[in-house]
Regions:
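Catalytic-core regions of core metabolic enzymes
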Residues: 2-501
Length: 501
């Protein structure tokens, strides 16, 4: 019978990235069914309670405390896992070189150690991120806020304060940026060039920058804004500042803007600013339609189309290419680590006239809960496994590809599923071998649906893309050059006899 074990470490703080890495290692230990290392805020305790691993001893945990929570197959496995967690918390350098950096107790102390620094990357629980961002701004630092769960009013106030000081606030929930060739957060190794990217989406920036790189071009900067910057309450403060910066940069010749559809009033602000530039823009408002753009801007419906416009190329459609299993029918089940890649797939399904459901639906798609209350699914389904409902108390699937194992096993066993659509996202911050994990999971599983995947990354990444593609191909996975082409391949494999919505 499973046992629940908790331990509270008083007045203990570790960076959220380190906590996720420790969680991943503990969850992989023998006999561990679920594991979470998390700061003891009320919201985080609720996450652990929902996951079924919060013990009564953790009820008294404060926001300054660290909770170790796990479910194990037996007490012996649980105690061994707790001991390993204690060791890694006390000696985070054991995680590897990335964790073995000198640390400072305060931001002021860090500035004394590195006085030339001009940017703070903030990765603390949302309850503390606002205060740390204010400290950064007051010290004259730009702020990239990796943290989420920051109130919208606080985000707007931070960005107004930054604008007054001539500083950037990227985020909250900004997972990706590349500044002068230096990747921050989840980002890929791409060459420098003359294309600037502004993105409200981390995986959107990653996909477009990698497609540009694989076409032989490069970027100047990729500036993340956070997913809510284009809401009316924030007013696109960071987006507008980023346009100003890239417009003034002599090395940037073409500017790309990627986001979900903005509020109408905010869209006018952004497009009015675009119109004042002498530079060409490519604008991808994912899921938007009939947006009137200024003369110097072109619209792109997908991330792939965005890259094609920028580099002046276009790949042949998978609808005209031979595929094994063509016309096999059934339903497509998409299981994505990247939220924007999930959105792009839905858009392509809707463009093809196909009904699609998702836990994060784009306009025209239907909403679905995680379990759909036991209802039989009769439409194609695209699931964002990085959404909060799947990551409460667990690592993000880009850290831990095992998050996809359960939903993938369900899809493999579902007789209504004919095709499975997957994304593999590489780069700094991600799992060291996501393709290897998937290949091992698929090993020995016969009579399975057709599996189509894309690999977002470059050959220069810590996990070289060419090696990841080879591992997937050896496992019998069809690998497309982009997420859009993988989606087109899945649709093509359905064959010509499709029910159109």
């Amino acid at each position: 019978m499973s046992v629940i074990l908790n331990e509270v470490r008083r007045a203990t703080y570790l960076d959220s990235i380190i906590l996720m890495r420790i969680s991943r290692q503990i969850a992989a230990l023998p006999g561990i069914e679920e594991a979470g290392l998390i700061i003891g805020t009320p919201a985080n305790k609720e996450i652990l309670r929902d996951a079924g691993i919060l013990g009564s001893e953790s009820d008294s945990a404060e926001p300054s405390d660290l909770i170790l929570a796990l479910r194990a197959s037996d007490a012996l496995a649980g105690e061994a896992a707790l001991a390993e967690a204690r060791r890694l918390i006390d000696h985070p350098s054991a995680l590897g070189a990335a964790a073995a950096v000198e640390s400072s107790r305060t931001m002021r102390a860090a500035i004394k150690r590195l006085p030339a620094a001009n940017l703070a990357l903030i990765s603390v629980p949302g309850d503390f991120a606002v205060a740390e961002a204010h400290k950064a701004l007051e010290l004259g630092l730009h702020a990239m806020i990796f943290s989420d769960n920051v109130p919208l009013d606080d985000e707007a106030a931070l960005k107004r304060k930054a604008r007054e000081r001539g500083l950037f606030v990227m985020g909250p929930d900004c997972g990706t940026a590349i500044i002068g060739g230096v990747p921050l957060g989840f980002a890929n190794v791409v060459p420098q060039g003359d294309i600037g990217i502004i993105g409200a989406s981390g995986t959107g920036i990653q996909e477009v920058s990698c497609l540009i790189a694989r076409a032989g071009r490069g970027i100047t900067h990729a500036l993340g804004t956070g997913g809510r910057d284009l809401k009316a309450e924030v007013g696109a403060i960071t987006t507008l500042m980023a346009i100003d910066a890239l417009d003034a940069d002599d090395h940037t010749k073409h500017i790309v803007l990627i986001s979900k559809p903005p509020a109408a009033s905010v869209a006018r602000l952004v497009l009015d600013r675009v119109a004042k530039s002498a530079k060409p823009f490519t604008i991808c408002f994912l899921g938007a339609s009939d947006v009137a753009l200024p003369a110097n801007a072109r619209a792109a419906a997908t991330l792939k189309a965005t890259a094609d416009i920028v580099v002046g190329g276009s790949a042949a459609s998978w609808a005209q290419q031979p595929l094994p299993g063509l016309g096999r029918g059934g339903l497509v089940r998409g299981l994505f680590a990247g939220g924007t890649l999930c959105s792009e797939a839905q858009i392509i399904f809707r463009q093809a006239g196909l009904a699609v459901m998702s836990n994060v639906p784009v306009p025209g798609a239907s909403a679905i809960g995680r379990a759909q209350d036991g209802k039989v699914l009769t439409d194609h389904v695209m699931i964002d496994l990085g959404d909060d409902e799947f990551t409460r108390g667990r690592p993000h699937p880009m850290f831990e590809p095992g998050v996809r194992d359960g939903p993938l096993a369900e899809a493999l066993a579902d007789p209504s599923v004919g095709i499975i659509l997957l994304d593999i996202v590489l780069g700094y911050g991600g799992h060291p071998d996501p393709a290897g994990h998937l290949a091992a999971f698929l090993d020995g599983r016969e009579h399975r649906p057709l599996i189509v995947a894309s690999v977002t990354g470059t050959d220069a990444d810590p996990q070289p893309r060419n090696a990841q593609v080879e591992a997937l191909a050896a496992a019998g996975v069809i690998v497309a050059d982009s997420n859009a082409e993988a989606t087109e391949a899945a649709i093509a494999a359905l064959g010509p006899s499709l029910d159109r919505a």
